[in-house]
Amino acid sequence: MRTNYCGLISEQYLGQTVTVKGWVHRRRDHGGVIFIDLRDREGIVQVVIDPDTPEAFAAADSARNEYVLGITGRVRNRPEGTTNDKMISGKIEILAKEIEVLNAAATPPFQIDDENISENVRLTNRVIDLRRPVMQRNLRLRYQVAMGVRRYLDAQGFIDIETPMLTRSTPEGARDYLVPSRVHPGEFFALPQSPQLFKQLLMVAGFDRYYQITKCFRDEDLRADRQPEFTQIDLETSFLNEDEIMDITEGMAKQVFKDALNVDLGDFPRMPYSEAMFYYGSDKPDMRINLKFTELTDLMKTEEFKVFRGAADMKGGRVVALRVPNGAKFSRKEIDEYTKFVGIYGAKGLAYIKVNDAGNLSNGEDSGLQSPIVKFLSENALKEIIERTAAQNGDIIFFGADKAKVVNEAVGALRIKVGLEHGKDNGYFTDEWKPLWVVDFPMFEYDEEADRYVAVHHPFTAPKEGHEDLMVSDPANCLARAYDMVLNGWEIGGGSIRIHRADVQGKVFAALKISPEEQQEKFGFLLDNLKFGAPPHGGLAFGLDRLVTLMTGAESIRDVIAFPKTQRAQCLLTDAPNSVDDKQLRELSLRLRQKAVETKEA
């Protein structure tokens, strides 16, 4: 019977006989004495086997990496000069008396301590990959976060209630994962994109405070921080306003960080959405980076430089500057790389001015400003740019000029890239946790392809008080009672006060050009129940995967999920998705128009 975990044996066990079980992490033969580093989920302990115990020695001699062993022996001090203060077990070793080979192991596809493994190899051999200490630490922290959330919400009076995994398909932005019904031929369930409507119905039912940690599913194009199935910390509460909900969830985030990382997050400042977009080009600004946009649209309306003037005059156009301290030393190669980078976001180029002498702002050949565009701008404009940006000698000023969406995304991404690459050495990056709330989101945004307004969050978000009439008369300026929790440039949680009156919900649907017939067909179960005395309610959902990725510093969200999908929504371990036989399809009343094609990742 095991008495101790390997990684938890310390000097307090000196002289005691212990039994440990785990995997051979490393085996070394030193002049007739065999050393085995035995590993389990808690860490590694060094085991010494000498020829005086012939049976144990023979077992150790036959063992190889990843063999599963049970070892009984006496705990003793390591010899002087061989200790490792970074490990709990670093000052002791076990002198083995008995060794039982519990299982042999084939040679693994990579060494457990190898850090240079391609992600595809890791995901194909995920079980072996999960043995690596970094993956064990990541998933242990994930567990600690989830348990911390449960403890906090339980103490706040929230009730854990499960909502259905098989539900009806409703439009919430992304495509649904559909599940054909065998019992009802030609009809489909959908896997939930979120428990949104069910948690609102739980409030109507009178449960007051609900939460669950649940799986959600979205069939969308994947990015580094997205998975087709993901885990959400979901909560909803009745009779509280947005300030009260933000206070509760902010307290939860602080408690989780304190318990898991011993980090004090401090207070969360609040920033209106309009301010976030104006200064940072993003609704999730990374406040570790002390760089801001400077608005130049008004200034460029009177300039002759076509690139800037055209953007300033176009409907929805924008011209901004981004001053980077000490950036004049950027090489031509670096600027070319940044130009290529902003092109990913639709920018057609990247204009810049290097400030060599802010006292000489002419646009002639002797100018203290170095740039191909200086000669196209008036001296008044150059002076105004320097004043507005507060540029100093040695700075560089980058420019974005295009539709506001392109400028915000391109220059916003450039701000992050430059800040992370050069900010620490030049005083505009602070390596600490920087949380905030982004509030006062627009209720709607215009979708040019669909030629109509769509909901920024979802169509169940309540308009800000006094903005209800704007839903019809001026939807572009209608604000929502929505709020996002942002941490170091990541949205880790988003929520809103919901619509609790059926008539107001109908107005929102009308503003979104959803007909009464479509409203009833898709959302009748919600509208019908809102009529039975629905309380004011609101909530928030955290992305657990994203939160743990931030807390661990993992490179990818896939490093904090036990069995993730690739960016092509495949599981390389199980080879899913896979084709099914015709009998299964017939039982579901389905016939494929196109057979499966080979798209598996190599």
UniProtKB/Swiss-Prot annotation:
Gene3D superfamilies: Bira Bifunctional Protein, Domain 2, GAD-like domain, Nucleic acid-binding proteins
GO molecular function, one term: aspartate-tRNA ligase activity
E.C. number: 6.1.1.23
Record-marked site positions (Important for tRNA non-discrimination): 30, 81
Enzyme class: ligase
Disulfide bonding pattern of the chain: none
Stretches for region Aspartate: 196-199
Taxonomy, superkingdom: Bacteria
Database matches in InterPro entries: Aa-tRNA-synt_II, aa-tRNA-synth_II, aa-tRNA-synth_II/BPL/LPL, Asp-tRNA-ligase_1, Asp-tRNA-ligase_1_N, Asp/Asn-tRNA-synth_IIb, AspRS_core, GAD-like_sf
Catalytic activity reported: tRNA(Asx) + L-aspartate + ATP = L-aspartyl-tRNA(Asx) + AMP + diphosphate
Record keywords, A-Z: Aminoacyl-tRNA synthetase, ATP-binding, Cytoplasm, Ligase, Nucleotide-binding, Protein biosynthesis
Annotated residues for binding of L-aspartate: 172, 218, 457, 498
GO BP, sorted A to Z: aspartyl-tRNA aminoacylation
Binding sites annotated in the UniProt record for ATP: 218-220, 227, 491, 543-546
Database matches in SUPFAM superfamilies: Class II aaRS and biotin synthetases, GAD domain-like, Nucleic acid-binding proteins
One Pfam family named in its UniProt record: tRNA_anti-codon
Cellular component aspect of the GO annotation: cytoplasm
Family: Belongs to the class-II aminoacyl-tRNA synthetase family. Type 1 subfamily.
Function (record text): Aspartyl-tRNA synthetase with relaxed tRNA specificity since it is able to aspartylate not only its cognate tRNA(Asp) but also tRNA(Asn). Reaction proceeds in two steps: L-aspartate is first activated by ATP to form Asp-AMP and then transferred to the acceptor end of tRNA(Asp/Asn).
Assembly with partners or alone: Homodimer.
NCBIfam families documented for this protein: aspS_bact, PRK00476.1
Record protein name field: Aspartate--tRNA(Asp/Asn) ligase
Protein species of origin: Neisseria gonorrhoeae (strain NCCP11945)
Gene transcribed to yield this protein: aspS
